[in-house]
Amino acid sequence: MKKSSVGFLLLLAFALSLFAGCGGDTESTTLLSDKNVNLIFVVSPDLANDPLGDVNPATANLNNQGLQRALMLASYLKQQLLGTNNVTGIHALAPMTHLQTANQFPDMAAIGFIQQFALLNKITIQGTTDNSYPLSVGYAEGDVPAGVAVPAPYVPGAQGLAFNDTHENNIKLATGIINGKTPGFHVFSAPWETTSALLTAINTTMGYHLRLPTSFQGSNHVYALTVTPSGEARLLTFDSKLTPPDTYPVLPFSLASASCTQQNFFSYSRTNGVNGVSVPAGTNTNQTVYLIRHAEAHPSSTFEDGNFVAAGQWRALALANVLPNALRGQSSPTMVYSIDPAQSFTYAGLSVSYVRPSLTVLPYAIANNLPFNLVSSFNIGLATDPGVAKATSDFFFTGGALSNQTVLVAWEHEHFPPLLTYLLQTYYGGNYPDPALSWPHGDYDTIWTIKLDGSGNLTVDNALCEGIASIPLPKTAPEF
């Protein structure tokens, strides 16, 4: 062989070794090291980037196949990337920062794609350990979309991701984790546009010279930026090669049933002209609203992480099958509403986003191809704040936008009694005392039904329930 050829091959080998040392993108099948700072990027599908067909084009939500992939991917992440290690942090897209279709539906795919994974981890709060982990979805300053309530206050420890990182809060979050040099596993869940831009910004800001993916290959591909204690960075690609079915997930076994006896029965009505009652101006007509509580979340009275626990995943996934029976003889939901999961707070030194109501009804909306909307124009605040009850009542029961609809609403249960009390009070024109309403702390099953007829006359009761017994629910999430 000529000396020039030998020299060229040696130079090529040297160049390749340098490239590898700078963190060339390589496919990996090995566990990530718990001695490194690991940033794991789960890429959720959206309408613009959905090569595997995981999104419903009408609702911009996951379809059954997308939900199945999310459930299966959770097990892959735990088994193939983390092993026995626990996650350190989970940051997901704030849904209201990415509105899709002409109906401006929020992007719920990112938190829906990572929820099952969160429940395969553990957290200890004030002495209680359970299978759950907070999802950070909160707004950073400057990222609150128009028309969305500004946090009061902002909760930096619960910061999520903005679809367009206009104020560079995404990159500040990621580089802050890297520069903190604390080993762990930090998961980011967002669409390809957000993930790709964030990887590029990290690469530039940190001077890594990594070879980045140039196109979206589908949500089977997971990217891991792993940084050693010495500062050497590598970008690894994991291909889960999942082939989920396009049918709704089937739980491993049937859940124990429950009767509708957790609350004392009540029923109230307000009819125009009866006992001096007048229907308030602007009241909706021909409307039914089902109020349900989020899934199981409190293994003890001092446990709070903004999410529900693994037992609650059984309820959330079962709703698609049990609600039709629970609502037999009643009108079926035509749309689903919940609280903006980006609303965040602190509890016992922990910063969390209030994701559990929306994630409780997300599977039901997916199974039934229903529009999923978030209430984001006001902060949910304290249940005892009369302004919150008024804002909630006005949103759901006045203005005509929800007339002629049957709405399934997942909310925080302590807000229900003040909400219903306020709504009844708006009809007062006679000698009606305030109702003595309450919702037991351990009740995750009861359904409150509010109906407005064609004239706006009101009836409310708590006769229905989902029919799922809480206590027998498994303490670990179903695995797929």
Model-identified regions with their sequence ranges:
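Bacterial N-terminal signal peptides that target proteins for export
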Residues: M1-L9
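Small-residue packing motifs within transmembrane alpha-helices
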Residues: L9-A13, S17
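Active-site-proximal alpha-helix that buttresses catalytic centers in soluble enzyme cores
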Residues: T29-T175, T195, T200-L402, F416-F480
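Generic beta-sheet signal
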Residues: N38-I40, K181-A190, Q287-V289, L402-W411
